[in-house]
């Protein structure tokens, strides 16, 4: 097991990895619509390459189970992984503990008022709507990446749980209003991207090489 701190890697989706897919991954990739195959191939190749470097083992030996449209999993004892992509950028995470990540462009144009009112808990949306326009847009984005990361961390869905997650910027606390969960979370900024991370050890996360 590598160092006991979560790792993040941010890179272009098309970055060369020099790594192949497993036989199962090749089959899953071939079954996808042609338009989706390059993204699936690139994400799994990069994930294998990052993990191989982290564990110092050949990429083909990484015990990764990663069918399309399912959260990627490692065998017990190898830790946990999470994937997020936005446009042509890819965010990967590894952690000794359950982890979720999300990625959004810092300059993404969005209807911050509408998002806050429709999808955020009342107490959070009220605080957000009191902010000036650009500050509000950035605050909504920072909250959003934490919440999407939290949904991946708990293995849930946006439709089921987005409105139950609340980010208290004053307390710096992310909480699930129904289940009482309060996982550690971070919103990091790198090269014009907001990177949300949720899970144990978030405070000690380290960027991997060449992020």
Regions picked out by a protein language model, each given a short descriptive name:
Residues 1-211:
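Conserved nucleotide-ligand handling architecture
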